[in-house]
Amino acid sequence: MIDSVDPTKNFNPLWRAIFSGEHPELRRGRKMFRLMSPTAHDRCRLCYAGFDGFSAPVMRAIGRGQWLRNPHFCEKCESVLAQERGGAEIEIAMLYADVRGSTQLAAGMRPAEFAALMQRFFQTAIKIFTWTDAIVDKMVGDEVIGIYVPCLTGPDYRQRAVAAGLKLLRATGHADPAGPWLSIGVGVHSGETFMGSIGVEGGNYQFAALGDTMNLGARLVGAAKGGELIMSATVWNDVSGEISAEPRSLELKGYAERVTAYVARIQ
């Protein structure tokens, strides 16, 4: 029998302060690192430590070099967040992208060849996520997930998520006359999620985004055919004046009612 769960146990005021940019130590740190790295153009999105310019070697020496998984953050900020248990409920946009027909692809290739193809896909996705100010949430199997947090990405976080999805479709060759080098589908949704560091007491913890919003995003990408970006109505309302899309009524697993989504393709 599962014990009852207190939903407030995982809430942490530090995470809320970080996501809002109002944490006092964060404000002091940003002021200090701006002074220490006056020539930096690329900075940690949390503490503002400079990743380039004349102070970059010093930043690396004190543990403020770029975190490899998410180049928008320094290694120190990542370690602090990983150790700070709990999180906060915040509004985000998420982008899911996964490979179409990966089982058949893997069956027709040597394991090393398939691994190289997935590596190319992940590298392409991460580069686009970096350009559009996303957090790389997960790279699992044949799927990659990017998270767009307003306090880090800006008020146009939904538009950036859609732009990233379209860039990824183009980068994988879906606009090429010869066809894509890898067929993928993309799903974009937005809403409130729980974001923070979760895991087992005394065991491993990881940074994660959880909730029904994430589940719906996963269902949307599952409904996308190769070359399609399927977005929820929430996202479409923000980008309808910028791109073309057609409505599609979807029957999604786990949802009692059909969901109206919008399908965009590379022109």
Each language-model region and where it sits:
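Regulatory cytosolic signal-relay segments
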Residues: 1-90
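Short amphipathic alpha-helical segments
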Residues: 41, 45, 71, 75, ...
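Catalytic NTP-binding/metal-coordinating core of nucleotidyl cyclase/transferase enzymes
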Residues: 84-163
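A residue-level structural signature of the nucleotidyltransferase/glycosyltransferase Rossmann-like core
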Residues: 94, 185-186, 228, 261
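Alpha-helix/helix-capping structural signal
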Residues: 100, 192-193, 215, 234
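Catalytic core of nucleotidyl cyclases, primarily class III adenylyl/guanylyl cyclases
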Residues: 128-160, 171-212, 260
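Conserved, well-folded catalytic cores of nucleic-acid-processing
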Residues: 168-171, 175, 201, 219, ...
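Cytosolic regulatory/linker segments at or just downstream of nucleotide-handling modules
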Residues: 225-267
